[in-house]
C-alpha cells in the first residue's frame, strides 16, 4: 500500500519542488512546443494547456545550439586548430586556390550578396560550434536555388577547387567546416517549403530549412517531424539528412533512412540528380538516395528533401525518474517496452556526473529531485491519442517499476513548463559541457548492457584528471561519452584514444552512432568497417567525385584524399 501511495504521489502530485512553480521560480518557463516537438496535452486533472499557437514564430520557445546563441559562456573555451590534431593532415596539392577570376565568376552566378568575403562572417563559418576545429576559407557562397548550386559545383570541379557544404554548422566532428581553404557553400538561403500533403503527411522542402521551423509549420498542420535534435533551432534538414542524424525520436520513428522518401542532389560536376520521389513504394532498381543519406556531403550536395512526417498525437506524458544503478536503468527500459508498448516515444538517460555539470554550468536549471542524490536519471516520454488509456498504462508501468525497486523517486510533468524544464536538463548537457571548458566527445553505438561499462573503465583509466560523463539515447543503444577537462591536452587525449575506439570495436559497437565521422574520425573508420568495405566506399567516392573536391579529408582516411 505504501508503494501505491508513492506511485500516486508521482502521478498526481510529483515532486513539490518541481510542480509548485510559486515556490520554485528557478525553473525555466516557456510556451509552445517542447524539445520533442509535441504540444503537451495533459488530462484535465493534471492541468490545461493552450492547444494552438497562432503565430509560431512569435511564441515558439527555441533551444538553439548555434555559436551566436551560445556566444556568452561563463568559462572560456579553448580553440584548437586542425594543425594541433594528433595526426597531421596535409593539404592536397592538386587543389587550386581561389583567385579574382573565380570570385568574379561566382558574382555573376549569385550576385554580390551571395558571395561573402567579410572576415568576421568567415571567422564564424570557419569554426565549428565547439570551437575545436578551425579552417581558413576566404570565401563563402550562398546559393538560392538548385541551378546556382549546380553552376557553382561545375566551376569548382573544372578548376579543382575544393568545397565544403555547410548548413547550420552544428556538427560535432568537424564535418561542416573547412580543413584548409575550401570554398564554403552555405545552403541557408534555400529555405522554402515546396509542398505538403495533409493526407499522406509527405513534406517536400529545400535543404536550408531549419528543423524547428519545419516542426512549427507541421504543428499547425497537425503533424511533426520524425526527428528531433537539441540543435533544432539552428540545424538544417539538408545537414540532418546528409549526416543521417538520429536524435530523440529514433526510438519511435526510426532513422532517416526509413523516413526520407527522396532527395535532390548535385554531383561535383554540376549534374542534378532528381530523386525527389514522394512514393512510399518504388521498387525500380537501386535506391540511390541512400548513398547520399549519411554521406556527409562527400558524394553530392543535397538541395531538396522529401520526407514522411507522422501525425501529431494529442496525449503526451513525460516522466523524470531516478535509478540507483545502471542495471535498474536497463530493467526499466525493458519494463517500459513491455508495459508502454507503442506509446513509448523517448527513453533517455544521464548519469550523476552529467546532472552535476548541468546544475553547475547551465543557467536557470534546478534538480527536479532535490531531496536525494542518485547515480542515474531517466527521462521517459509517451505519445498517444487516448489520454485515459495512456495514463492508465503509465500508472501501471510506474507502479510495477516502483514495486520492483527500480525507481526510488521521480516526477511526472504536470504542464508544459515542467516538461520543458525536464527536457532542458537532458538537452542542455552539451552546452553545460561547453561552458565547463574543453570537452572530448564520443558518439558511440554499443550493446545496451555494455554502455556504462565503458564509462566506468574510462573513469578508472583517467582517475581525477578529467570528468567522465555518460548520457544518451538508452532506448537505441547510443552512448554519448564525454570527457570534460579545463583545457585541451594531448597527454590526456593519448589516454582516451585509441582506447575508446578499441574498446568499442572489441564489443562490436560503432564509433559513430549519429554524429558522423567528419574530420575527427575519418582515420578511425577501420574500427567499425572492414578494409573491404572501406575500399568499396572509396570506389564509390572516385566514381561520383573523381577530383575529390567535395568535403575532402572527411569520412575516408586522409591517405585516400591525397591519393585520389
Regions of interest found by a model, annotated:
Residues 2-564:
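Noncatalytic alpha-helical scaffold of FAD-dependent oxidoreductases
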Amino acid at each position: 500500500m505504501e508503494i501505491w501511495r508513492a506511485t500516486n504521489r508521482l502521478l498526481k502530485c510529483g515532486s513539490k519542488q518541481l510542480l509548485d512553480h510559486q515556490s520554485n521560480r528557478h525553473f525555466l518557463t516557456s510556451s509552445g512546443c517542447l524539445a520533442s516537438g509535441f504540444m503537451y496535452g495533459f488530462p484535465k486533472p493534471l492541468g490545461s494547456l493552450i492547444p494552438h499557437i497562432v503565430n509560431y514564430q512569435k511564441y515558439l520557445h527555441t533551444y538553439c545550439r548555434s555559436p551566436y546563441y551560445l556566444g556568452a559562456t561563463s568559462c572560456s573555451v579553448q580553440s584548437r586548430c586542425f594543425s594541433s590534431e594528433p595526426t597531421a593532415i596535409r593539404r592536397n596539392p592538386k587543389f587550386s586556390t581561389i583567385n579574382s577570376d573565380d570570385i568574379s565568376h561566382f558574382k555573376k552566378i549569385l550576385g554580390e550578396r551571395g558571395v561573402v568575403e567579410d572576415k568576421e562572417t568567415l571567422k564564424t563559418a570557419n569554426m565549428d560550434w565547439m570551437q575545436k576545429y578551425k579552417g581558413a576559407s576566404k570565401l563563402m557562397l550562398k546559393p538560392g536555388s538548385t541551378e546556382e548550386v549546380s553552376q557553382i559545383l561545375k566551376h569548382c570541379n573544372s578548376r579543382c577547387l575544393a568545397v565544403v557544404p555547410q548548413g547550420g554548422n552544428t556538427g560535432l566532428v568537424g564535418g561542416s567546416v573547412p580543413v584548409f581553404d575550401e570554398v564554403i557553400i552555405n545552403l541557408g538561403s534555400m529555405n522554402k517549403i515546396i509542398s505538403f500533403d495533409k493526407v499522406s503527411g509527405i513534406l517536400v522542402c529545400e535543404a536550408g530549412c531549419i528543423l524547428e521551423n519545419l516542426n512549427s509549420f507541421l504543428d499547425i498542420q497537425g503533424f511533426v517531424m520524425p526527428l528531433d535534435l537539441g540543435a533544432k533551432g539552428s540545424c538544417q534538414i539538408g545537414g540532418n539528412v546528409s549526416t543521417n542524424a538520429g536524435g530523440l525520436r529514433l526510438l519511435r520513428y526510426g532513422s532517416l533512412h526509413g523516413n526520407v522518401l527522396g532527395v535532390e542532389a548535385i554531383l561535383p560536376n554540376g549534374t542534378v540528380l532528381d530523386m525527389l520521389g514522394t512514393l512510399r513504394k518504388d521498387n525500380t532498381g537501386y535506391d540511390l538516395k541512400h548513398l547520399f543519406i549519411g554521406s556527409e556531403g562527400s558524394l553530392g550536395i543535397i538541395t531538396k528533401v522529401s520526407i514522411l512526417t507522422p501525425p501529431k498525437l494529442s496525449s503526451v506524458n513525460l516522466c523524470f525518474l531516478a535509478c540507483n544503478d545502471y542495471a535498474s536503468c536497463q530493467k526499466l527500459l525493458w519494463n517500459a517496452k513491455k508495459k508502454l508498448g507503442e506509446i513509448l516515444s523517448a527513453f533517455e538517460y544521464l548519469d550523476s556526473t552529467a546532472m552535476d555539470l548541468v546544475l553547475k554550468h547551465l543557467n536557470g536549471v534546478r534538480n527536479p529531485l532535490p531531496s536525494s542524490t542518485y547515480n542515474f536519471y531517466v527521462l521517459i516520454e509517451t505519445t498517444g491519442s487516448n489520454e485515459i488509456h495512456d495514463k492508465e498504462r503509465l500508472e501501471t508501468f510506474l507502479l510495477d517499476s516502483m514495486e520492483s525497486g527500480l525507481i526510488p523517486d521521480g516526477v511526472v510533468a504536470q504542464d508544459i513548463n515542467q516538461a520543458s524544464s525536464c527536457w532542458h536538463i537532458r538537452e542542455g548537457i552539451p552546452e553545460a559541457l561547453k561552458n565547463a571548458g574543453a570537452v572530448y566527445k564520443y558518439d558511440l553505438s554499443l550493446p545496451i548492457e555494455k554502455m556504462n561499462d565503458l564509462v566506468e573503465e574510462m573513469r578508472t583509466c583517467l582517475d581525477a584528471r578529467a570528468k567522465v560523463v555518460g548520457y544518451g539515447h538508452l532506448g537505441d543503444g547510443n552512448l554519448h561519452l564525454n570527457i570534460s577537462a579545463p583545457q585541451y591536452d594531448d597527454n590526456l587525449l593519448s589516454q582516451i584514444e585509441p582506447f575508446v575506439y578499441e574498446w568499442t570495436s572489441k564489443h562490436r559497437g560503432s564509433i559513430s552512432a549519429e554524429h558522423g565521422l567528419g574530420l575527427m574520425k575519418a582515420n578511425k573508420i577501420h574500427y567499425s568497417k572492414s578494409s573491404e568495405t572501406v575500399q568499396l566506399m572509396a570506389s564509390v567516392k572516385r566514381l561520383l567525385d573523381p577530383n575529390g573536391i567535395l568535403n575532402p579529408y572527411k569520412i575516408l582516411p586522409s591517405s585516400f584524399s591525397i591519393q585520389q
